């Protein structure tokens, strides 16, 4: 319901304050991805977890493929003069209402309530399992925060950079983001779901580091799309892999809570990253901003290779 209220405010927004209120409400009520991740862990065992998480990520990438292009197209359809984006907002409202009705009427409960004896048995099994886990939630959460901090900052600066270098408009930006989404969805459906989650994370952070280095120096659109391909690899791997690793470290009874905490650290990074990185971009320029981003991502690479380990049961 919070998402419906958020987009309804966007539909009605004729001034910046109302639009800002819609974003605040949307941020406070955001939880669809976390819900999907929790459901994925409920219906999969340890051996299936990585592939199931990758399936959720693939669905996200497919939406990321068509969403920006559709939004860019609808932004050119002005039905309300005081709110040029009312058409795009109205269609978003239709999608969210449809999703809410589907969740309410069609989605079964996946977290089945167990009897007391079953709970005790599962608690004993969970105790035996968690003693063999290898990665602390603190390390996983910090890795997630650090990665999202730099990745989201770079992500939000891309429209500025593409406009400065190539005079990109909404159509061109939508095409670029659609390319990233297509590549990411293909990778998640073919590569990510077959790899171990730790290797998935390591592949993604190295790819992101390479993308930062290329973005700092690129001068042609071909190089831009090369960097976009690297970012697609990152989008298809890191968050999915970290979610899988985090789920391995939690018992069935606490998995939703642990994944919620894990995602909240990512949201902190998503809050701070765009503000700090885009400020640095405009204050110091592209070269310095992406050099700082590359340095930060190098630290994330060190965490992925030097701190995280493969869970013993996976």
Regions found by a protein language model. Give the residues of each.
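Hydrophobic core of transmembrane alpha-helices in multi-pass small-molecule transporters
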Residues: 6, 17-31, 223-237
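Cytoplasmic helix-loop-helix junction between adjacent transmembrane helices
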Residues: 20-60
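Glycine-rich segments within core transmembrane alpha-helices of 12-TM secondary carriers
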Residues: 51-75, 265-273
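A membrane-interface helix-boundary motif in multi-pass transporters
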Residues: 76-94, 279-299
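C-terminal membrane-cytosol helix-exit motif in multi-pass small-molecule transporters
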Residues: 95-113, 303-308
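Short amphipathic helix-loop junctions that connect adjacent transmembrane helices
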Residues: 156-173
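Transmembrane alpha-helices of Major Facilitator/SLC transporters
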Residues: 173-195
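C-terminal transmembrane helical hairpin of 12-TM major facilitator-type secondary transporters
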Residues: 199-242
């Amino acid at each position: 319901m919070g998402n419906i209220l958020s987009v309804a405010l966007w539909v009605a927004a004729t001034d910046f304050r109302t639009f800002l209120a819609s974003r605040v409400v949307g941020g406070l009520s955001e939880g669809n991805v976390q819900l999907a991740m929790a459901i994925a862990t409920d219906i999969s065992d340890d051996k299936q977890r990585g592939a199931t998480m990758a399936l959720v990520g693939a669905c996200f990438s497919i939406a990321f493929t068509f969403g920006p292009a559709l939004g860019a197209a609808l932004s050119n359809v002005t039905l309300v003069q005081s709110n040029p984006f009312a058409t795009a907002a109205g269609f978003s409202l239709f999608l969210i209402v449809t999703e809410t009705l589907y969740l309410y009427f069609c989605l079964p409960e996946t977290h089945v309530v167990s009897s007391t004896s079953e709970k005790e048995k599962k608690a004993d099994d969970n105790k035996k399992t968690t003693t063999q886990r290898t990665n602390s939630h603190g390390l996983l959460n910090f890795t997630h925060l650090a990665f999202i901090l730099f990745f989201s900052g770079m992500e939000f600066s891309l429209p500025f950079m593409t406009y400065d270098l190539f005079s990109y408009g909404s159509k061109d930006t939508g095409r670029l983001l659609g390319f990233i989404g297509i590549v990411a969805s293909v990778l998640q459906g073919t590569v990510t779901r077959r790899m171990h989650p730790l290797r998935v994370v390591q592949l993604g952070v190295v790819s992101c580091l390479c993308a930062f280095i290329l973005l700092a120096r690129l001068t042609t659109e071909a190089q831009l799309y090369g960097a976009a391909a690297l970012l697609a690899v990152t989008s298809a791997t890191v968050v999915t892999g970290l979610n899988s690793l985090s789920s391995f470290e939690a018992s069935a009874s606490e998995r939703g809570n642990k994944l919620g905490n894990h995602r909240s650290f990512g949201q902190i990074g998503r809050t701070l990253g765009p503000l700090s990185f885009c400020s640095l971009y405009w204050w110091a320029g592209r070269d310095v901003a992406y050099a700082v981003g590359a340095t930060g991502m190098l630290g994330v690479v060190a965490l992925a290779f030097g701190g995280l380990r493969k869970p013993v049961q996976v």
